[in-house]
């Protein structure tokens, strides 16, 4: 291209100066050249500027980009600048600057309009998904740079699903009317899996243990179903953070993931990924103290917030929890702008860290406002209630970070970014919350199997963010054999804007147990309120209205309803007919998994009672308690679990308990069938002897889960277990012919081994058990398989 300009010599003579087109096109390669023949000091003047070739772009827009007005003196360099601005605008395919006498003609050829965007060769990713990745759209202006960028985005999209060999070639087809069709020709290639995940530098933990920490998985038996066994750079970055957090929570404060290498296999169809770790040493807490650098603040009042003991493995989470509690105490005392700074002193000799919590006065900065963007469905208040800080409160960076984590933990957003910026005044900040919505509803079609119920079908429809209010609504239908259980659940997690959970549960069930000759039907309605009463303790209050009925006692529904005979205890339950139960109850739970100080040891305790008799037919007190403890040993390769449960039903005002009121013992002791142990009418005149359940139960279960030498990508581990317990106690022990039914406490126990198989469609467990302590009339089961799945 050649640009001619009229030189300002006072006589109107024409002089030509050439700006080489190669110099101008070199701008695209970020190199700017100017012909040495042009003297930058020379100036030119155009009386008029004419525009040619524009169809959609307004002349004023072109003049604005050119920056040359009528009668203005311009240099050759300024002409170059005008060209570059026009060409760099992305609006024109070609640009020419042509002088004609005293007129500068700007001739442009606009980029064509995109007529159709098409994708060819794509099977794994559908057209609508690919269209959402790219910028080029129908009826928009065609841009070569944008099309190339879109090809790269499509390639990345395939890379994210493990198809590293995918190639994308854009094709542009010219059409009449200055239009083009853009086609992306895609060669998807094969999935490039991660064949092996390995580690170097790890001495404290095995590769097997560290692989369980990672979000990325290595290809295994179900490689066709697993989506996390492909090489995704962003996922590996997340894995780096997971590894770092894992080590630091176990006292390795100096841990570093020094690098990640990914190498092709010899066949170039998979990757070997290796994490290079520098562990360092594991530290424990040394001396832990608190001092105050704020006049008038007594540190003794804050010492009780220290829940850390010397000699315990160092954990950043434990330190953060103490800081949060101390700053909360300061706020309750009306001490604003008090911050807690942890000062750590290393003791290399004994590998301890002395932590001194220092109360200091921070800068007086206030929160001007909290701006929330990106929430197209979720209401602002759902996000805002995750912040304990409101407009006008003192600014606390740690609280803002904690609030950001709470927003992410909701599960409503694919991404949640929380940043702060300066407000209108130097002592104010604005908190910007930018979220990206993600689907929160789910439809589940599931299958289940149990030795008692056989094969079952489960249907569920759930919405975790109902109407964008943060509420949960779920409908579930479960069938197994002749049993059916339907339920509707609604949960409002923040009633009245407080940490007060309100729930309603409606349930209807019908059972025809294949191991017993009777049927039951239960319908219940139960609203509840749950709220925290301590950092790790919660209290749940509930009301329950229930109608239940027992019928067809002693009739074999599989044999045309013939009467087989049954215990008079069960016949009495049938004679009372449908019964209404109305009562209130509570459950207190204490769970150390909330803000856990030790990641390897967890403890949960719960105790609850139901007081029935607020109207209805049943007057009773039902009490249940449970303790569960879990720890990991042998470099966290072996998981030990212990569980202790107990319960009691106390009938009031001389009432007798029915089978529907008593405990069945199902699942408490492995090695026995449902209703397979406990009181039983053993009269020889009965064709069938059904279990009667008991007013009391106790159970202790001990499990050990460990690797059995198989590659962990198979997801198979082994386990040993031992159970002991009993179900006992009846209000009416008169059996057939007045014979006494033995309802005393008789211990049962069993041992066995388990095979755990974690599959992409759900966890599967096979139990092989042997009853050790039993009665002759007990019904044993030596094998049990359970699986629960969604697909």
Stretch-by-stretch model annotation:
Residues 2-19, 38-451, 460, 474-494, ...:
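Periplasmic polypeptide-binding modules associated with outer-membrane biogenesis and secretion
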Residues 387, 420, 440-449, 457-480, ...:
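Transmembrane beta-strand segments that form the barrel wall of outer-membrane beta-barrel proteins
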Residues 409, 424, 442, 450, ...:
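C-terminal outer-membrane beta-barrel translocator/porin domains of Gram-negative envelope proteins
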Residues 413-414, 441-443, 454, 466-473, ...:
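Repeated loop/turn-to-beta-strand initiation elements of outer-membrane beta-barrel proteins
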Residues 448-456, 475-486, 513-520, 578, ...:
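Solvent-exposed loop/turn segments connecting transmembrane beta-strands
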Residues 455, 479, 484-486, 506-512, ...:
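Transmembrane beta-barrel architecture of outer-membrane proteins
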Residues 461, 585, 753-762, 780-791:
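Outer-membrane beta-barrel "beta-signal"
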Residues 486-578:
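Transmembrane beta-barrel wall of Gram-negative outer-membrane proteins
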């Amino acid at each position: 291209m050649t640009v001619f300009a009229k030189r300002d010599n006072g006589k109107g003579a024409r002089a030509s100066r050439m700006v080489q087109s190669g110099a101008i096109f070199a701008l695209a390669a970020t190199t700017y050249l100017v012909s040495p023949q042009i003297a930058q000091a020379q100036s030119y003047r155009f009386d008029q500027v004419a525009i040619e070739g524009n169809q959609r772009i307004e002349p004023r827009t072109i003049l604005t980009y050119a920056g040359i007005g009528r009668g203005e003196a311009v240099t050759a360099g300024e002409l170059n600048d005008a060209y570059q601005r026009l060409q760099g605008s992305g609006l024109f395919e070609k640009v020419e600057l042509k002088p004609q006498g005293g007129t500068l003609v700007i001739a442009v050829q606009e980029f064509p309009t995109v007529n159709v965007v098409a994708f060819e060769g794509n099977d794994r990713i559908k057209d609508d998904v690919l269209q959402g990745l790219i910028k080029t759209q129908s009826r928009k202006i065609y841009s070569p740079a944008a099309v190339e960028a879109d090809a790269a985005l499509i390639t990345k999209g395939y890379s994210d699903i493990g198809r590293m060999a995918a190639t994308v070639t854009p094709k542009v087809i010219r059409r009449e009317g200055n239009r083009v069709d853009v086609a992306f020709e895609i060669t998807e290639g094969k999935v490039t899996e991660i064949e092996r995940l390995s580690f170097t530098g790890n001495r404290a933990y095995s590769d097997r243990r560290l692989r369980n920490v990672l979000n990325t998985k290595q290809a295994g038996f179900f490689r066709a179903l697993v989506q996390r066994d492909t090489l995704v750079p962003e996922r590996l970055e997340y894995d780096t953070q997971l590894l770092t957090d894992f080590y630091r929570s176990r006292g390795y404060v100096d841990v570093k993931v020094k690098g990640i290498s990914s190498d092709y296999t010899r066949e170039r169809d998979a990757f070997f990924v290796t994490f290079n770790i520098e562990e360092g040493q594991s530290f424990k807490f040394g001396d832990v103290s608190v001092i105050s650098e704020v006049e008038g603040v007594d540190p003794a009042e804050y010492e009780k917030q220290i829940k850390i003991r010397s000699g315990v493995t160092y954990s950043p989470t434990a330190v953060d929890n103490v800081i949060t509690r101390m700053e909360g105490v300061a706020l309750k005392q009306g001490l604003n702008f008090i911050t807690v700074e942890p000062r750590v002193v290393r003791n290399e000799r004994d590998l301890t860290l002395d932590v001194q919590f220092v109360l200091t006065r921070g800068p007086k900065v206030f929160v001007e406002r909290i701006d929330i963007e990106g929430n197209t469905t979720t209401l602002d208040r759902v996000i805002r209630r995750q912040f304990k800080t409101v407009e006008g409160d003192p600014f606390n960076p740690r609280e803002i970070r904690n609030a950001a984590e709470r927003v992410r933990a909701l599960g409503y957003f694919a991404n949640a970014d929380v940043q702060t910026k300066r407000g209108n005044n130097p002592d104010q900040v604005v908190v910007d919350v930018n979220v990206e919505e993600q689907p929160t509803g789910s439809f589940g079609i599931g299958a289940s199997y149990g030795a008692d119920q056989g094969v079952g079908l489960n249907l569920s429809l759930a919405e975790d963010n109902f109407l964008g209010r943060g509420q949960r609504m779920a409908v579930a239908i479960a069938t197994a054999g002749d049993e059916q259980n339907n339920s509707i659940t609604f949960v409002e997690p923040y009633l009245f804007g407080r940490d007060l959970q309100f729930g309603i549960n409606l349930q209807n069930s019908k059972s025809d147990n294949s191991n017993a000759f009777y049927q039951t039907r239960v319908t219940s309605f139960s609203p509840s309120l749950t709220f925290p009463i301590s950092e790790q303790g919660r209290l749940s209050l509930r009301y329950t209205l229930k109608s239940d009925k027992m019928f067809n006692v002693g009739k074999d529904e599989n044999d045309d309803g013939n009467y087989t005979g049954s215990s008079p205890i069960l016949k009495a339950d049938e004679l009372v007919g449908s019964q209404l139960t109305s009562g209130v109850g509570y459950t207190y739970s204490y769970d150390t998994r909330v803000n856990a100080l030790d990641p390897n040891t967890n403890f949960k305790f719960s105790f609850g009672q139901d007081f029935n008799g607020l109207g209805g037919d049943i007057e009773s007190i039902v009490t249940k308690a449970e303790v569960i403890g879990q720890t990991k040993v042998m470099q966290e390769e072996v998981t030990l679990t212990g569980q202790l449960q107990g319960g009691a039903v106390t009938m009031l005002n001389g009432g007798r308990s029915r089978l529907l009121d008593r405990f069945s013992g199902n699942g408490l002791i492995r090695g026995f069938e449902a209703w397979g142990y406990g009181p039983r009418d053993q009269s020889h005149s009965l064709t069938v002897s059904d279990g009667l359940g008991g007013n009391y139960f106790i159970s202790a279960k001990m499990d050990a889960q460990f690797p059995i030498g198989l590659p962990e990508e198979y997801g198979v581990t082994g386990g040993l277990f031992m159970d002991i317990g009993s179900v006992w106690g009846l209000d009416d022990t008169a059996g057939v012919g007045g014979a006494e039914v033995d309802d005393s406490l008789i211990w049962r126990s069993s041992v066995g081994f388990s095979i755990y198989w974690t599959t992409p469609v759900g966890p599967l467990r096979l139990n092989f058990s042997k009853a050790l302590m039993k009665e002759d009339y007990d019904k044993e089961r030596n094998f049990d398989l359970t699986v629960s799945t969604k697909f």
